[in-house]
C-alpha cells in the first residue's frame, strides 16, 4: 500500500494521542512508533535533541514537547494518525485541544514512578472529554521500575478500573519482554536485535507461570462479565477464543469501562510493536465514537448531528494553528464529516467568514504529504486559511454547523515587554499576533497607564517559551519585565439605586444621560463573570440607548476601583433613567454607564482577588518539616499529605504571588531531592494586609 493513500475504510483508522507526565517517555515512544511503522529511518533520541516530533528548536533544547504535531503512519494495513500532546502543566491548553479531536489515547507512565501529579491532571482532562485509553508502563528497564506498583497507583490515585493484558519478563537491566495474557505466550527481544525490529514468541518462563495464570484469570473474569454468552461459556469451563477475548476487551475500552495495561521500554526498543497491535485491537475507530454534535450558527438550541461519513455535508474543527517556515500559516483540522477538495470554498461558521482551502497535507512531523481531498475521520494540515483560529468550525456553506468549541482558561501570570528599537516594535506586534493565533491561552493587552505591552500566560515556563520564540522565529529584540501576577477585583455586597447624570452644555448640542442602577455579586453557571439586565419600563430610556449603558459598564470594568485590575463577578441591573430629546446620544449613555459603574463598585465593598495555585511537592521524609514550614510562610494552606513510593507528598493551595523563585528555594532546602508541580486552581480574596500593599504599589503611594 502506498504511503500517501488515505484510507477510506474508517474501521482501519485510529486517531490517537499519546499522553503522559513530562518524563514518562512520551516523545521517545512516539519516535519508536514512527520507526517501526517505517516512516523514520533513523531513530531520533530526545537526549540528543533529534526527535522527529519535537520540531521547534526550543523543544529540542529543552527535551520537552510543546507543539502537538500530527503525524500519520501505517501499521499492518491500518492507518494511525498520532497527535503528540505535551506533558508540561503550562501547556494544558495544547493537551485539552488535542483531546478534543482524538478518538482514543495511549497513556504512558514511568515504570518507576507510576502515576505522577501531572499524569493525574492529564488523566482527568481525558476523563472530561471521555477519551478511551490504553496504558503503557514505560521505562521498564530503569532501576527501581516496578510494573505491579505502577498498576496499583493507577487504581489508587486515578481510581481507574485497569486490566493488565501483559506482564513484564524480567525487570530493570534484565527486562527482556512481555507475557501476553491474551495469547498466553511470552514475547522476548533478544540481545542481538539492537533496534528491536524482531521479537521471538516463546513459552511463558516457568517462574512466571503462576503469576501469569493469576492475572489471566482476572482478565477472563472481566471479559466474561461483558456478555451473557461469554459468561455462560466461561462458567461452563470452556476456553474463550482469542477473538472473543479481544472483542470483549475492545468493548470495555471503547466504553471507558476499563483500561488495558501493557508494558515495555521504548528507549530499549522493547514492547512497542505489541502496543501498536493493541492500538488497532482496542482503541476506537472514528466509527466507534459518538457522532459530532453542533448547532446551527446563531441558534444555540438547534442541534445538528454529523456522522463520520463522506456522504454527509462537510464539517471540520480547527484544533491548532502553527507557523511554518515556507507556507506561513498551517491550520490543523479534524474532519468530522463529508469530504472536500483542495481549492474549495468553505465557510468558517464560528465567525461567519468565507475561507478557501489552499493545499491539503497529511503531516509527518514537519514533512508534508500533499493530498487532493480531505475526508471524514482524518486529520489534515491546511494552508490558505486567513481568519480561522483554534476552536473554529469549518463547514459546507450550504449546510452550516458550529461544533462545540473548547474552553480556555484565563492567564494567571503576566510580563511587560518592551521592544528595544523602532523596527523591533513592528516585529513585536506581528509576532504577538502570530503567537496569539497559535495559542489561545496567550493573551495580550496594552497597559493604559504605562503604555507597555503586557503578555499573559499559564505559567513562567509558558511565557519564557513564548518570549524565546519571539526572539528566534521573529527576531524580536525586547526587554522583558519581571513576571507579575494577574490580579482581579470584585465586589462583596449588593448596592441598590446608584444614580449618575452625565450632562455637558457647551453651546450647540450638549450631552445628557441619566441612569439608575443596582449592582450585586454574581457568578454564572457556565463561568460567566458579568451579566447585564434592564428593568427600564415605559420608555424612560429609549431602547437603542440601553446597549450603550451595558457597553459603558463593561468598559469601566477593565480598570477596577481599588488598584486598576479588571473587575469580575458582578451583575448590573439598569433600573431607571432619563433622556433628553436633543442632547442624548449613545455616547452620552455609554459615559453615564461607565461612570455609574465606578461609583457603584466603590460602594459595594470592593476586594482584590489573586490566583491560587494547587501545588504538589514530592520530598524525602527528612525534609518534610522544612517543606511544610516553607509553604506556610508563603501563605499556603496544606490540603493533604500522603506517602508515595517512599517519598512524602504535600498538597497545598498557595497564592501564585508567593511562588516566584520557588524552584531555587526548594532545591536549597532539600539538596535538590524534592520536586514540585503547580497548576492554577481558583481565584480567592486577598487578605487585608496584602491587599494594602498591592493597592499602594498600584497607585504608586
Swiss-Prot record:
Stored Gene3D superfamilies: 3.30.230.10, 3.30.70.240, Elongation Factor G (Translational Gtpase), domain 3 (3.30.70.870), P-loop containing nucleotide triphosphate hydrolases (3.40.50.300), Translation factors (2.40.30.10)
Localization (cell): Cytoplasm
Binding-site residues, GTP: 20-27, 84-88, 138-141
Pfam families: EFG_C (PF00679), EFG_III (PF14492), EFG_IV (PF03764), GTP_EFTU (PF00009), GTP_EFTU_D2 (PF03144)
Keyword Lipid biosynthesis appears in the UniProt entry: no
Paired cysteines (S-S): none
Keywords: Cytoplasm, Elongation factor, GTP-binding, Nucleotide-binding, Protein biosynthesis
Keyword Oxidoreductase attached: no
GO cellular component, one term: cytoplasm
Major location (coarse): cytoplasm
Limits of the tr-type G domain: 11-287
SMART domains found in the cross-reference section: EFG_C, EFG_IV
InterPro entries attached to this UniProt entry: EFG_II (IPR041095), EFG_III (IPR009022), EFG_III/V (IPR035647), EFG_IV (IPR047872), EFG_V (IPR035649), EFG_V-like (IPR000640), EFTu-like_2 (IPR004161), G_TR_CS (IPR031157)
One example GO MF annotation: GTPase activity
Highest taxon listed in the record's lineage: Bacteria
Gene Ontology terms: biological process: ribosome disassembly
Family listed: Belongs to the TRAFAC class translation factor GTPase superfamily. Classic translation factor GTPase family. EF-G/EF-2 subfamily.
Function per UniProt: Catalyzes the GTP-dependent ribosomal translocation step during translation elongation. During this step, the ribosome changes from the pre-translocational (PRE) to the post-translocational (POST) state as the newly formed A-site-bound peptidyl-tRNA and P-site-bound deacylated tRNA move to the P and E sites, respectively. Catalyzes the coordinated movement of the two tRNA molecules, the mRNA and conformational changes in the ribosome.
The protein's name: Elongation factor G
Organism, scientific name: Mycobacterium marinum (strain ATCC BAA-535 / M)
Primary gene name: fusA
